[in-house]
Swiss-Prot record:
It comes from Flock house virus. GO terms for biological process: proteolysis; symbiont entry into host cell via permeabilization of host membrane. The keyword ATP-binding does not apply. Ca(2+) 1 binds at residue 161. This is Capsid protein alpha. It is an enzyme of class 3 (hydrolase). Changing residue 405 to A: Lack in specificity of viral RNA encapsidation. Ca(2+) 2 binds at residues 161, 221, 273. The active site is at residue 75. Ca(2+) 4 binds at residues 221, 273. Disulfide bonds join 69-318. Its EC number is 3.4.23.44. Signal peptide: none annotated.
Length: 407
């Protein structure tokens, strides 16, 4: 008989002890003093940015005013600022010229408007038969900014009595159609071309033979064809365009005296190479007082037969003059602003980023576009080594600074 009452073997209970580690395990091959050094570097970087922010707040106001004068429309800002914040050190007079004018375009004609860097002159214009370009028989005449004679006098020999030289920060133009929607027709085309003032020595048939220096314009051939980079749109949509300095430096140009026509009246057009004539008319009202380092904006308005095209033309430019010590303007001059690398860098960035032209309706948002370009550029520039990167790092984090200057 099997005994089933034998005691069963009891299994030993297994006890599992779990240890919870509350302290973080140091990473392998990373000493603690390395982490401390890294954290200290971050704190120092933030401290340096804070100090540069304070310095930038003091020094960048003329730079921001310079950007606003160069790119903001006059209905937003008419302050000429303190001048161009580059390495020039001297007394200057800043001026923002503005012209508002109603204009009508002749039917069956193509009207050419040149926004050229000529101080005191808002634009030059001429009309040619529809579908053609200016020829040797074409003469461009000026339309002045208000105050031309107060700045440059009423004679061709008094142009430099107040100021001796000048340089441009920007030129702007807008055409805002006012035509009846049932009567307008035609188109607007815009492009730019580099035009420079040149001095050429011509022989004079005298006994004994001699020569004379004559001022002529080179680059006007760019007006005779639509450039590859251009803007074309229906007339009723209008246009807005800007031109900025694309030279390495903002160089001053001399104020010229005794020039009413280019080429001069006693020099044949063919001998100078100019395709057409620039005539400023009576010296009591206008004149050619110089030519700056800016690309000329060319606007062609085509109006077919039967069209009734009218518009408001608005032009403005930001210029810096050097006043003469014995002139009344000298008392209104001021020292050129200190160097602002950030403002100059952003000026170049905006100039490269803007299109040749936009429709007139987008002029209202052009300053917003400029602000977005500046902000995005500063965010990218904060990673650049050197003073530009350091200053950009501070300014990109200081939104109140932008707001204080209209940004």
């Amino acid at each position: 008989m099997v005994n089933n009452n034998r005691p069963r073997r009891q299994r030993a209970q297994r006890v599992v002890v779990t240890t919870t580690q509350t302290a973080p395990v140091p990473q392998q091959n990373v000493p603690r003093n390395g982490r401390r050094r890294r954290n200290r570097t971050r704190r120092n970087r933030r401290r340096v940015r804070g100090m540069n922010m304070a310095a930038l707040t003091r020094l960048s106001q003329p730079g921001l005013a310079f950007l606003k004068c160069a790119f903001a429309p006059p209905d937003f800002n008419t302050d000429p600022g303190k001048g161009i914040p580059d390495r020039f050190e001297g007394k200057v007079v800043s001026r923002k010229d503005v012209l508002n004018q109603s204009i009508s375009f002749t039917a069956g004609q193509d009207t050419f408007i040149l926004i050229a860097p000529t101080p005191g002159v808002a634009y030059w214009s001429a009309s040619v038969p529809a579908g053609t370009f200016p020829t040797s028989a074409t003469t461009f005449n000026p339309v002045n900014y208000p105050g031309f004679t107060s700045m440059f006098g009423t004679t061709s020999t008094s142009r430099s009595d107040q100021v001796s030289s000048f340089r441009y920060a920007s030129m702007n133009v807008g055409i805002y159609p006012t035509s009846n929607l049932m009567q307008f027709a035609g188109s607007i085309t815009v492009w730019k071309c580099p035009v420079k003032l040149s001095t050429v020595q011509f022989p004079v048939a005298t006994d004994p033979a001699t020569s004379s220096l004559v001022h002529t314009l080179v680059g006007l051939d760019g007006v005779l064809a639509v450039g590859p980079d251009n803007f074309s749109e229906s007339f009723i949509k209008g246009v807005f365009s800007q031109s900025a300095c694309n030279e390495p430096d903002f160089e001053f140009n001399d104020i010229l005296e005794g020039i009413q026509t280019l080429p001069p009246a006693n020099v044949s057009l063919g001998s100078t190479g100019q395709p057409f004539t620039m005539d400023s008319g009576a010296e009591a009202t206008s004149g050619v007082v110089g030519w700056g380092n800016m690309d000329t904006i060319v606007i062609r308005v085509s109006a077919p037969e039967g069209a009734v095209n009218s518009a408001i033309l608005k032009a403005w430019s930001c210029i810096e003059y050097r006043p003469n010590p014995n002139a009344m303007l000298y008392q209104f001059g001021h020292d050129s602003p200190p160097l602002d690398e950030v403002a100059l860098q952003e000026y170049r960035t905006v100039a490269r980023s803007l299109p040749v032209a936009v429709i007139a309706a987008q002029n209202a948002s052009m300053w917003e576009r400029v602000k977005s370009i500046i902000k995005s550029s500063l965010a990218a520039a904060s990673n650049i080594p050197g003073p530009i990167g350091v200053a950009a790092s501070g300014i990109s984090g200081l939104s109140a600074l932008f707001e204080g200057f209209g940004f």
